[in-house]
């Protein structure tokens, strides 16, 4: 009958469908065309937190016996900035133990600019440290190399790096116990380093993403 058991997902009640549609039909095609003309890169950026208490997921178990995973209950989390590139599948990332803020974001972007030579179209959401005066000044100062593009509000489903975060959590933290914070860091860094060597896997995320939201790939 075409039905299958699927996990539901939350959808914000603040969605602006007109802006979301405009992104698909107007903004994204313009970015793609401009990037191809300039032979530039298109980076989708986002951040993720990986808490020491781990994360839970489905797993096999005997009927009537719910799996249990030990947890430290500690709320400290390893935070990661990430960018994935649309044409090449390259992954750039930086883990931090501090806070996501304008300064840490600028530091990350500065490192990315130092490691690349092409013009970059950076697509990200409207997080405060993305839109702050300090960050906007950074974009203005680096306009020769960097063009900021903003996703529609409340639209994480329009950012393909979300699929990567899910994969990282599945491999690095799902159903795992971390007695020490350093163990989380090692697990996440190992997983990210692996994906950084799997450009085709990252490119596959873009294909899935484009099919999901109806974008031209």
Go through each PLM region and give its residues:
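Short functional hotspots at interaction and active-site rims
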Residues: 1-217
């Amino acid at each position: 009958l075409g039905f299958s058991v699927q996990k539901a997902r939350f959808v914000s009640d603040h969605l602006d469908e007109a802006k979301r549609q405009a992104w698909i039909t107007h903004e994204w095609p313009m970015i793609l065309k401009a990037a191809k003309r300039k032979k530039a890169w298109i980076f989708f950026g986002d951040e993720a937190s990986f808490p020491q208490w781990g994360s839970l997921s489905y797993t096999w178990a005997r009927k009537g016996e719910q799996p249990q995973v030990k947890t430290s209950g500690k709320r400290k989390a390893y935070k990661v900035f990430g960018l994935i590139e649309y044409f090449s599948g390259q992954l750039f990332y930086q883990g931090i133990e501090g806070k996501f803020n304008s300064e840490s974001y600028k530091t990350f972007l500065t490192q990315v600019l130092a490691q690349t030579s092409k013009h970059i179209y950076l697509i990200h959401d409207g997080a405060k440290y993305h839109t702050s005066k300090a960050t906007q000044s950074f974009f203005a100062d680096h306009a020769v190399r960097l063009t900021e593009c903003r996703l529609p509000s409340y639209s994480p489903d329009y950012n393909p790096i979300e699929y990567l975060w899910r994969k990282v959590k599945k491999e690095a933290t799902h159903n795992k116990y971390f007695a020490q914070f350093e163990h989380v860091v090692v697990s996440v860094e190992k997983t990210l380093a692996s994906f950084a060597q799997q450009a085709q896997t990252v490119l596959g995320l873009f294909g899935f993403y484009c099919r999901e939201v109806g974008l031209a790939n």
